[in-house]
Amino acid sequence: MVNEQIIDISGPLKGEIEVPGDKSMTHRAIMLASLAEGVSTIYKPLLGEDCRRTMDIFRLLGVDIKEDEDKLVVNSPGYKAFKTPHQVLYTGNSGTTTRLLAGLLSGLGIESVLSGDVSIGKRPMDRVLRPLKSMNANIEGIEDNYTPLIIKPSVIKGINYKMEVASAQVKSAILFASLFSKEATIIKELDVSRNHTETMFRHFNIPIEAEGLSITTIPEAIRYIKPADFHVPGDISSAAFFIVAALITPGSDVTIHNVGINPTRSGIIDIVEKMGGNIQLFNQTTGAEPTASIRIQYTPMLQPIKIEGELVPKAIDELPVIALLCTQAVGTSTIKDAEELKVKETNRIDTTADMLNLLGFELQPTNDGLIIHPSEFKTNATVDSLTDHRIGMMLAVASLLSSEPVKIKQFDAVNVSFPGFLPKLKLLENEG
């Protein structure tokens, strides 16, 4: 990775932009289009490093995936014709690829090995392996907890499973494995987590029932799958950086078009509204994956907030940049119930606090979150993304509060989810 990036951007930020396609939906669209025999087209996908790893793996399984301007054309022989891979399936830095394919490949019964980069090797997989093994999956990890994951053929059984954590990745691994079971599977969630797998199953003609915190699949649901075209909305997790940037930079007025506002993902909008931020939604569409244009204007005197409970899984990936936003509130804010942050690309509780504290902000890490005090940018210490794309972008947004350039090590980690992030931020500066 590039050792150091100097961020020298000042406000106000003004203009209208779109952000790249949603990462979670792009992964799932590639997976489902690859399972279905025939041609599916995925419009405006995210072609960052993570989603490319998912594409690479399905190509090794025998799926033809072509990139054509702003779309992917997936021509699949169908899951029954998948090849047995004769090399390790490399998932890179992608937890979504690793965990969802652990379930899918177990269901398919394809002998394979999943392995990622150093970061993935440090992220626990037991939360996925436990339910998969209860489904009779033949899957093992190093010390039964870490990659590489070794998968061998088995006959998957349906289960009645109560989730241990509010994790869309764990839920989705179970759901993908359940497609191949001769029995129904029932999942009971602790809190609502992002439901893209459920909505996209339906889009590709796979029956699934969801009511409240209960999700039920039918036996051998894979037999219903059909190819489908899918339009990927803009990623709200990527939009979050521009939302916060506009809120904290005097004189800013930014509009982001075609952003996915699925209610299981739109926690940042709820949080900004609770803090009194000037945010407006318009051009809203309805459907399984609703979208909107979002206008954000600079807002002084933001109110402090307590972020906890069901709000946390709805904003889990945005919490680092939300923590930065909270430093600009008029009182102390808290984030609780966010243990899930510990098993992301980094322990984001610690990395958020450590990097922002280096710049003079005042954050206290706790076992399950952060205490964030009103504070200002005080020093231009060199900071580090620690190869975590969301930490890198959060630090770039923090630089808007500085009168001097900020140096960020390993900044090219942002390419995992947002190639072109910095040019887009500079575009708003130039228009301002």
UniProtKB/Swiss-Prot annotation:
Pathway: Metabolic intermediate biosynthesis; chorismate biosynthesis; chorismate from D-erythrose 4-phosphate and phosphoenolpyruvate: step 6/7. Its EC number is 2.5.1.19. Phosphoenolpyruvate binds at residues 23, 95, 123, 169, 348, 390. Keywords: Amino-acid biosynthesis, Aromatic amino acid biosynthesis, Cytoplasm, Transferase. It catalyses: 3-phosphoshikimate + phosphoenolpyruvate = 5-O-(1-carboxyvinyl)-3-phosphoshikimate + phosphate. CDD domains: EPSP_synthase (cd01556). Transmembrane segments: none annotated. GO terms for biological process: amino acid biosynthetic process; aromatic amino acid family biosynthetic process; chorismate biosynthetic process. 3-phosphoshikimate binds at residues 23-24, 28, 167, 169, 317, 344. GO terms for molecular function: 3-phosphoshikimate 1-carboxyvinyltransferase activity. It comes from the Bacteria. GO terms for cellular component: cytoplasm. InterPro entries: Enolpyruvate_Tfrase_dom, Enolpyruvate_Tfrase_sf, EPSP_synthase, EPSP_synthase_CS, RNA3'P_cycl/enolpyr_Trfase_a/b. The active site is at residue 317. It is found in: Cytoplasm. Catalyzes the transfer of the enolpyruvyl moiety of phosphoenolpyruvate (PEP) to the 5-hydroxyl of shikimate-3-phosphate (S3P) to produce enolpyruvyl shikimate-3-phosphate and inorganic phosphate. Belongs to the EPSP synthase family. Monomer. This is 3-phosphoshikimate 1-carboxyvinyltransferase. It comes from Staphylococcus aureus (strain MRSA252).
